[in-house]
Amino acid sequence: MKNDDEQSSLMVAVIGIIPVIWFALLVAPYLSSGLMGILDGVPEAMNHPFSIRLCGDSVKTVLIFLLSYGMGIGIYISTKKHYRRGEEHGSAKWGNVKKINRRYREKRFTKNKLLTMHVRISYNMRKHLRNVLTVVIGGSGSGKTRFFAKPNLMQANTSFVVLDPKGENLRDTGYLLEEKGYEVRVLDLINMEKSHCYNPFVYLKDDNDVQRLVTNLFKATTPKGSQSNDPFWDTAASMLLLALIFYLQYEAPEEEQNFPMVMEMLRAGEVREDDDQYQSPLDELFERLEMKNPEHIAVKYYKDYHSGSAKTLKSIQITLAARLEKFNLSSLAALTATDDLDLPSLGERKVALFALIPDNDTSYNFLVSILYTQLFQQLFYLADHKYGGRLPVHVHFLMDEFANVSLPDDFDKILSVMRSREVSVSIILQNLAQLKALFEKQWESIMGNCDEFLYLGGNEQGTHKYVSELLGKATIDTNTYGKLTGHSGNYSTNYQNTGRELMTPDEVRMLDNRYAILFIRGERPILDEKFDILKHPNVGLTTDGNGKPYLHGAVDRAVASISLGDSLEGEFTDDSLEVEDYELLSDEDLEEIIQKYQ
């Protein structure tokens, strides 16, 4: 802005040379008459401003005037002060809601992402040159679900991936989405017998995908804040898991590629501490594979794992079994035996994928972590290799309870590249401290990658301070009063200006629950009402508008099984895994079905 002002001043100075020369030529004929002649002749010359007569003094007069003009400009520049009246201590102020909304909205209401009651932003990012990555922070009861998540689900304008504690969003908006033509899929970790199945093995395209799966699994099953002084056991356990997965990936039939089969193989790898020469059925399985293909990647990892003593091998197996112990449950084994989710389809047609997790138990959240990672991989791959870099259907991740699910360490880098592929996220947190705890070093990068930040209110002091600093300082006028007593007493008033935060941390804490503070990159902050869900045109199809609640059905699945005898004759057979088609069942039949497969 300073450079622009300097260029404007220079242009005015150059243009000013023209009237200076013109006036000098008017004065030149009277120069020889002295000062009195000039004073008498100039008014007459001004009556005929374009009757310019060249004379012997014309050049001299022009030079004198130009020299004087130049000296005047020089004096002005040397004494010029850089004033910003009314902005001495800061220029922060609230943005104009209507103007900002017009700048970013799409005229058609349903084509937008809803931020506040009067501000929405188009998913056409090439129009406004902002991404639609959003951080939403609000304490318990501030309306993260009611004022942000639900209204955007009701827009029905993208594919959705929704982390849904308690299943509230699914129940309230599922019927609406089906009425709008969506395929609704549910990964239900609360009532697994009602869930669609999710098998991570289906989405393993190459060796790198296997490595990512194992790395993410170990990270997601590591308790928060725990640190191992000796990473050997986890490293060795990951080598064993890689060997088992690579074997299934390349040697087993498709229906046997799942975590229940991994558990069966692990149980078949008996280790006898008193007999180092003992060969388990699993040892024989890999020995046969080595005879067939010594360079097989599964063999390499198994030999690396198997290089220790029997006691060490048993400890490694126990370490891995502890990581995978949830897959011993028949409900989770059934859920992961096959796959119904078809993750790539979210980028090709409108699909709503809900991941239901208990709000008071994080035991199964590792599966959602794996789901997130594979979704990003699948959608990015689909965009790059099939659709020229942009998905035909935008995919919106509504990450409620963001802090409860482990994400890749390079999540900040994933954020920076998803925009161009028509993928966006809404990170929903209770306070800023949660983000700092998850990404101690990258949290600022994550905040910086999101062009929208919506604050709904809360009680965490660090968040109050952060929001106050983002709002900036304004310059305000103040006055002070003085009083002198005595025989000659008087009053005095002094006027001055000073700086003040647009909102102090205390004022941020006291934010009215009806209002939200919105930041959009490159715009003044906005103070606006939270979105009133009852005014949405589709509210009649939700439970908030007395519409039907959505009830997803029960899925009947057989748990994968494998029998490894000492001889291993036939190794893996097609009969070792029974997978039946599922059907939606009534609640009355549910208990009978569960008992049948126990």
Regions found by a protein language model. Name each.
Residues 1-142, 146-151, 193, 484-485, ...:
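Basic- and hydrophobic-enriched, low-structure N-terminal and domain-boundary segments
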Residues 130-423, 438, 442, 498, ...:
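P-loop NTPase motor domains
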Residues 176-177, 200-203, 441-445, 469-474, ...:
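Short secondary-structure boundary/capping segments
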Residues 415-517:
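Conserved ATP-driven motor cores of ASCE-family P-loop NTPases powering translocation/secretion/packaging/pilus
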